[in-house]
């Protein structure tokens, strides 16, 4: 009986090693493909928040890392510098809304050098389907309401959902989610407005080349 137990244990050990090896090989073979897919998805979003006619450079590789409290996280976040003929024309910056209903929401905001928002997209979230997930463009066009707006000293009070006295619609049964996104977008734009020149002077250091 002991021999049978040892034999079964050996078989299980071999099977476990083989399974681990298969997972490792699969990861090795697919990691480059996954990375390429992620880069393609990000580039697609970048071209949505900064239109093609506002840049002639490769946005994905024109990236610098930024660490700022206004971006909602202690981690360094990427900012993408758009240029035309070598001159800065727009900036897209990622930020975190830490106070979503179901956790952190990652957004990206594209804006002209003068601070006018070109577009905003949600990159990741865990909000409730049918309620808070309306921040996702695949679910509703709410996120498009930021385009064309600016953040100025005179309109800071308008950067709230309507329930709080601002200009942005909330969702039926879900106010926390849009409130968090509006706040995050406002703070990201404020940060870029206040640190415009410093951002443009930073080295490209995201490692996306």
Curated annotation (Swiss-Prot):
What are the entry keywords? Cell inner membrane, Cell membrane, Electron transport, Flavoprotein, FMN, Membrane, Phosphoprotein, Translocase, Transmembrane, Transmembrane helix, Transport
GO cellular component terms, A-Z: plasma membrane
Enzyme Commission code: 7.-.-.-
Q: Which GO terms describe its molecular function?
A: electron transfer activity; FMN binding
Lipid bilayer topology: Single-pass membrane protein
Required co-factors: FMN
Does DNA-binding show up as a keyword for this record? no
Summarizing the function annotation, the protein's role is: Part of a membrane-bound complex that couples electron transfer with translocation of ions across the membrane.
**How does the record describe its quaternary structure?**
The complex is composed of six subunits: RnfA, RnfB, RnfC, RnfD, RnfE and RnfG.
Name of this chain's protein? Ion-translocating oxidoreductase complex subunit G
């Amino acid at each position: 009986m002991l021999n049978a137990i040892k034999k079964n244990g050996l078989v299980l050990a071999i099977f476990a090693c083989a399974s681990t090896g298969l997972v490792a090989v699969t990861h090795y073979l697919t990691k480059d493909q996954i990375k390429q897919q992620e880069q393609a998805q990000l580039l697609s979003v970048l071209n949505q928040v900064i239109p093609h006619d506002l840049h002639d450079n490769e946005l994905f590789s024109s990236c610098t890392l930024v660490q700022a409290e206004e971006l909602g996280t202690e981690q360094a976040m990427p900012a993408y510098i758009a240029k035309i003929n070598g001159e800065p024309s727009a900036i897209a910056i990622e930020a975190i809304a830490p106070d979503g209903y179901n956790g952190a929401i990652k957004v990206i905001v594209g804006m002209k050098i003068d601070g006018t928002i070109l577009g905003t997209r949600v990159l990741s979230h865990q909000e409730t389907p049918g309620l808070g997930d309306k921040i996702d463009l695949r679910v509703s066009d709410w996120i498009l309401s930021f385009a064309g707006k600016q953040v100025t000293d005179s309109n800071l009070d308008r950067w709230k959902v309507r329930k709080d006295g601002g200009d942005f619609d909330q969702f039926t049964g879900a106010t926390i989610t849009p409130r968090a996104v509006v706040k995050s977008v406002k703070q990201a734009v404020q940060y870029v407005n206040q640190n415009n020149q410093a951002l443009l002077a930073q080295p490209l250091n995201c490692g996306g080349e």
